[in-house]
A protein has these predicted regions:
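Conserved beta-strand positions
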Residues: 63-66, 106-107, 135, 157, ...
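Aromatic/acidic polysaccharide-binding cleft in carbohydrate-active enzymes
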Residues: 157-232, 246-249
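Conserved, mostly hydrophobic/aromatic
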Residues: 61, 133, 182, 231, ...
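Substrate-binding cleft and catalytic face of glycoside hydrolase catalytic domains
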Residues: 1-119, 123
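Active-site clefts of carbohydrate-active enzymes
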Residues: 68-69, 73, 110-117, 145-178, ...
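Carbohydrate-binding surface patches
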Residues: 247-286
């Protein structure tokens, strides 16, 4: 309604439609009362403790999944001021008090509005409150710029894009490109929303999504999707301690490339050809050159 637009969201006149979200909530969905904030921080710690009793160790937490998503599924939108307040004044101190072994990351950052995320990180207290930053969806667009300005944080990707139940080659190419982008821009981890789905990939919320493995619920047969093999190109070779030397995003040439150096001192090249014809690719490694043909 016109009233809710005024009360809940900013005026978007003159704003670029490429921004997500197009409108920002100007009020925190979480009540900004110290009683609630303190209780919520304590809840995080109790959650960690409860899982420990079941012999499940939690090593990292983030304050909110997609604080800039106004959706039908459970969520909670926050303003920059609310995010700073809760993380700096409540969650970080309580975690350090009750569970100093658990690290706190700021995430999951799902907006491509650099000014909003920059406003949060520019608070001088943030660097002592959080150890790293987690990006997903539209947030990945501003990852390079944020990392350039704030190089002292650890970085991770927090949710691969789930697709629409196609389970096809194009979905695999999309994920391959995303991994190249996030790892190439300093993320030490890449995570998935769905490892396994059945049949048409319909989620519990009623929409179709993709997964690495597809199960036929009637026969019990398993299909490893093209996306599974796209991921395998990275995870069966890139081990802990591997460093990124250089990377190239997919461009007009339809090629993406990332060069690694393994702990054993070996070069590892992972490249993708997104075009419909085979292409030649040359990678220079010092005084040596690698020439290969990437099939379509």
């Amino acid at each position: 309604s016109p009233l809710s637009d005024v009360v809940l969201y900013e005026n978007t006149t003159g704003k670029d439609a490429a921004y997500y979200p197009k409108q920002l909530a100007v009020n925190d969905y979480f009540i900004q009362d110290s009683r609630y904030l303190k209780t919520y921080a304590n809840y995080f710690c109790r959650f960690v403790s409860a899982y420990r009793e079941e012999n499940i160790s939690i090593s990292r937490v983030m304050f909110q999944n997609e604080p800039w998503a106004y959706t039908i599924y459970p969520g909670c939108a926050w303003t920059p001021e609310g995010i700073i307040r809760f993380n700096v004044e409540y969650l970080a101190p309580e975690l350090k008090k009750q569970h100093p072994e658990v690290s706190l990351f700021l995430g999951t950052l799902n907006t491509n509005r650099f000014d909003v995320v920059d406003k949060i990180l520019s608070d001088s207290r943030m660097k002592d409150a959080v150890e790293g930053l987690g990006f997903q969806w539209w947030g990945g667009q501003i990852l390079p710029a944020i990392r350039k300005k704030y190089p002292y944080y650890k970085y991770m990707q927090t949710e691969s894009e789930c697709g629409s139940g196609t389970f096809d080659w194009k979905a695999a190419e999309h994920t391959f490109r995303l991994i190249n982008h996030y790892i190439g821009n300093g993320c030490e981890e890449y995570t998935f929303w769905n490892a396994i789905l059945s049949d048409e990939g319909k989620s519990s919320w009623g929409w179709k999504q993709n997964a690495l493995i597809r199960v036929d619920s009637k026969t019990g047969t398993i299909t490893y999707t093209p996306e599974y093999y796209a991921v395998k190109h990275f995870c069966n070779q890139v081990v802990s301690g591997t460093r990124v030397l250089q990377y190239k995003e997919k461009g007009e040439d339809n090629l993406s490339v990332i060069a690694f150096l393994t702990p054993e001192g070996k070069y590892l090249i992972v490249a993708g050809n997104y075009g419909d014809v085979a292409q030649q690719m040359t990678v220079q490694l010092g005084e040596k050159y690698l020439n290969v043909t990437l099939q379509a």
